[in-house]
């Protein structure tokens, strides 16, 4: 799958990882994929950016109740009162973290990038027993459909093929969020 993905080399430091003790969660020479086609569809993944706010906000807020059920207990996201400006600042933070290789948020987009249809998050481990934590969602109208099924197949294959993890954890997939929250914190050593 690596040949399907273009890559981008990071260009600045890893401040969050230093603060959390995960300075070396990725190899120094790791180049993250910048475009990942979703097989059998016209959809693709790419790193989200601040300029995507006008696409992201309706996707998130249009699926907010379900997303809160999934991510709310762990991340307190997305808040009911989130404004477009708060979303813009959140996407700016994601864009900066991606560039620094602190964490990754990939938008699921249609072919012409006119709509965000979901996201994939790839993060350093917060809980013991993994070297990367991965979660994803699709907008409400795609739940249970072909696009969600394709993403469910793609993400673990893509992580195995293109990411340097030996023990990735798929939150909400191979472990419930409740069980994940009960795990001890990851060691910072």
Where would I find each of the regions flagged by the language model?
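A short acidic/glycine-rich loop-to-helix N-cap element
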Residues: 143-148
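GNAT-family acyltransferases
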Residues: 2-142, 153-189
